[in-house]
From Swiss-Prot:
GO biological process per UniProt: DNA repair; DNA replication
Record-level Gene Ontology MF annotations: DNA binding; DNA ligase (NAD+) activity; metal ion binding
Protein name in the entry: DNA ligase
Catalytic residues identified in the record: 115 (n6-amp-lysine intermediate)
Known function: DNA ligase that catalyzes the formation of phosphodiester linkages between 5'-phosphoryl and 3'-hydroxyl groups in double-stranded DNA using NAD as a coenzyme and as the energy source for the reaction. It is essential for DNA replication and repair of damaged DNA.
Residues involved in NAD(+) binding: 33-37, 82-83, 113, 136, 170, 286, 310
Assigned protein family: Belongs to the NAD-dependent DNA ligase family. LigA subfamily.
Boundaries of every BRCT domain copy: 587-663
Keywords, alphabetical: DNA damage, DNA repair, DNA replication, Ligase, Magnesium, Manganese, Metal-binding, NAD, Zinc
Gene3D superfamilies tied to this protein: 5' to 3' exonuclease, C-terminal subdomain (1.10.150.20), 6.20.10.30, BRCT domain (3.40.50.10190), DNA ligase/mRNA capping enzyme (3.30.470.30), Helix hairpin bin (1.10.287.610), Nucleic acid-binding proteins (2.40.50.140)
Cofactor needs: Mg(2+); Mn(2+)
Gene symbol of the encoding locus: ligA
Organism placement in taxonomy: Bacteria, Bacillati, Bacillota, Clostridia, Natranaerobiales
Length: 663
């Protein structure tokens, strides 16, 4: 009986993987979705009934398992380096000239491939079985997200050969899947993702693998940094090997004999990029020959044998339907243009910021204007210019308000800023924005408390400030449209968990003007408890490196407000933590508080991320560039030019042999 069950399980797995490959890799399905689901359900039922036959390479792993507590950190034995960028033909020709000179090859062969806009992953297989999927992280240390990676249908759980191999590539979300996901989020009253890249990254970083399993993610491999027992001599041969192993390969990878052909390829895809079913933001060009790659080597940041041609920011024309004022959490009155919806760089743009009155006047944007817009860095929509030649004479200049458009309170420019601010701390618009900021990922990280939910809770009078979040009751939430018992429980659980956050996240969440995430960390480290910070004077604050007079004044002013004192009392009563963890207390090493540290090279006992965490836990700030303001330079193996610059500037250099004493 047991052998019959085992054979049935193995046959089902083989059949499911066959059809999975046909559908997700070859794009040539032979059975319907319903038939595929029936096979999967049968396998899951058998594995649950007979757990002794469960296997890490079973296709049932793709539906997602139990939620995780956190993602373990993993070190990349071969660093996942970033690529040098070229933004013009000249940049590509300069790259070609360097390659030709250093390899003594006048016409080296290149491989060009589309630069998919997604999340870089490292996949490790042992004996052909997927054993680890990790994010790039900072290039040396990433996160182990294996359960989530297994839900991506185009990533084989088992290769066609029993190889020990590492494969790197890009996980992404198609435009169609992105639109569907955002539609579903809108129907649930949740905030949409800004673009497909954020959607893919956000999905794969969910602690519950069942979430990415439902989000139709895809994957294209782009390199094989390690393979045991096989001799690959070129990038193009590696691509062919990946296809044979069962991966879906991007169909537009091309091999070229000249840089002129590469440039034509880049120009072609710059024009055709919008016609693809997924987002790309450039073209990656690699030297094909592995021996030549090895000969050129890499800097501490980039391989010398590859470059990324970055497309210019995508632009589009639209019409200004309206201009209105948005009131931010610190009272800033920001002019926003309401546009005829237009699609740019993976998302539909309906609004763009003009930042302040001066920029509005400088660009002379009027209601009814035809404008050119783009996404700055392909992220933030901005108005590039007005098409003055398209004006009809009916366009209306915008009259900037002298008071807050929401609460009608006085608006002022503080300290000659370009920004006009509402000075009423009780302004409803500010209150809502403060709550949204407070619950954001970098602050208290309250899952499910996005803009639309905050708007709903505020409009129903359930919350008026950030402290009210902690006094919400299940029956209040369950009675709201779009909420049920389960969603109410989930939100309340996320709120309860946020009470345990360290002081620095609470401090950042309070939204004090000029206090960003890094400043909040420095202040929390120095003062240890909110009560101590509330007593601080300007001179106490400016003693801390990176805390200037303007920020110090803003902090002291914030804690002098009666509104702030009432808020803190409510947060304390709710049980919100106001203390920084003891292991980060300054007593561990006060000599490093506020110091600037640069790390260069590689270290035997630490990854770069681990060193950064240790140093920042002691109150220092890790920066990437050596300057006269740098206090210490930590030097490992193969340090590059940073060591030389540190010596020229007479800076304190900490060798790896002295690292333990330093820490």
């Amino acid at each position: 009986m047991s052998k019959d069950i085992q054979k049935k399980v193995e046959a089902l797995r083989e059949k499911i993987e066959y059809h999975n490959h046909r559908y997700y890799v070859l794009d040539a399905p032979e059975i319907s979705d319903q038939e595929f689901d029936a096979l999967m359900n049968e396998l899951i039922e058998l594995e649950q009934t007979y757990p002794e036959y469960q296997s890490p390479d079973s296709p049932s792993q793709r539906v997602g398992g139990e939620p995780l507590d956190k993602f373990p950190r993993v070190s990349h034995e071969i660093p996942m380096l970033s690529l040098e960028n070229a933004e013009s033909q000249k940049g590509l020709l300069d790259f070609h000239q360097r390659v030709s000179k250093n390899t003594q090859k006048t016409d080296p062969v290149y491989v060009a491939e589309l630069k998919i806009d997604g999340l870089a992953l490292s996949l490790r297989y042992e004996q052909g079985i997927l054993v680890r999927g990790a994010t790039r992280g900072d290039g040396t240390t990433g996160e182990d997200i294996t359960p989530n990676v297994k839900t991506v249908r185009s990533i084989p759980l088992k290769l066609s050969k029993p190889l020990d191999i590492e494969i790197r590539g890009e996980a992404f979300m198609s435009k169609a899947s992105f639109e569907r996901l955002n539609q579903e989020k809108a129907e649930r009253g949740e905030d949409p993702f800004a673009n497909p890249r954020n959607a893919a990254a956000g999905s794969l970083r969910q602690l519950d693998p069942k979430i990415p399993a439902k989000r139709d993610l895809d994957f294209f491999p782009y390199s094989v940094p390690y393979i045991r027992g096989e001799n690959l001599d070129s990038h193009y041969s590696a691509v062919k090997e990946l296809k044979d192993l069962g991966f879906k390969i991007n169909p537009y990878i091309r091999k070229f004999e000249t840089m002129e052909e590469v440039i034509s390829y880049c120009e072609e895809w710059q024009e055709k990029r919008t016609k693809l079913p997924y987002e790309i933001d450039g073209v990656v060009i690699k030297l094909n020959d592995y021996n030549l790659q090895q000969q050129l080597g890499a800097t501490s940041k980039n391989p010398r044998w590859a470059i990324a041609y970055k497309f210019p920011a995508e632009q589009a024309e639209s019409q200004v339907n309206n201009i209105f004022i948005n009131v931010g959490r610190t009272g800033a009155l920001t002019p926003v243009v309401e546009l005829e919806p237009v699609r740019i760089a993976g998302s539909t743009v309906k609004r763009a910021s003009l930042h302040n009155e001066d920029i509005l006047r400088q660009k002379d944007v009027r209601i009814g204007d035809r404008v050119i817009i783009q996404k700055a860095g392909d992220i933030i929509p901005e108005v590039v210019k007005v098409k003055e030649e398209a004006r009809t004479g009916h366009e209306q200049p915008f009259v900037y308000p002298e008071s807050c458009p929401v609460c009608k309170s006085e608006a002022k420019r503080i300290n000659d800023e370009a920004i006009l601010r509402c000075i009423n701390p009780g302004c409803p618009a500010q209150a809502k924005e403060r709550i949204i900021h407070f619950s954001s990922r970098d602050a208290m990280d309250i899952e499910g408390l996005g803009e639309k939910v905050v708007e709903k809770l505020y409009s129903h009078g359930l919350i008026k400030d950030v402290a009210d979040i902690y006094y919400l009751a299940k029956n209040e939430l369950s009675n709201l449209e779009g909420f049920g018992d389960k969603s109410a429980e989930n939100l309340l659980q996320a709120i309860e968990e946020s009470k345990k956050n360290p002081f620095n996240k609470l401090l950042y969440g309070l939204g004090i003007r000029l206090v960003g995430k890094r400043a909040a960390q420095l202040l929390a480290f120095e003062f240890e408890h909110l009560d101590n910070l509330m007593k601080a004077q300007i001179e106490d604050l400016t003693k801390i490196n990176d805390i200037g007079p303007r920020m110090a004044t803003s902090i002291v002013s914030f804690f002098q407000l009666e509104h702030t004192h009432n808020l803190i009392r409510k947060l304390k009563k709710a049980g919100v933590n106001m203390k920084e963890p003891t292991e980060q207390n300054k007593s561990s090493d006060p000599s490093l508080t506020g110091k600037l540290v640069v790390i260069t090279g590689t270290f035997d006992n630490y990854t770069r991320r681990e060193l950064t965490d240790l140093i920042e836990a002691k109150g220092a700030k890790v920066t990437s560039n050596v300057s006269s303001n740098t206090d210490f330079v930590l030097v490992g193996a193969n340090p590059g030019s940073k060591r030389d610059k540190a010596q020229d500037l007479g800076l304190t250099i900490i060798e790896e042999s002295d690292l333990e004493d330093f820490l």
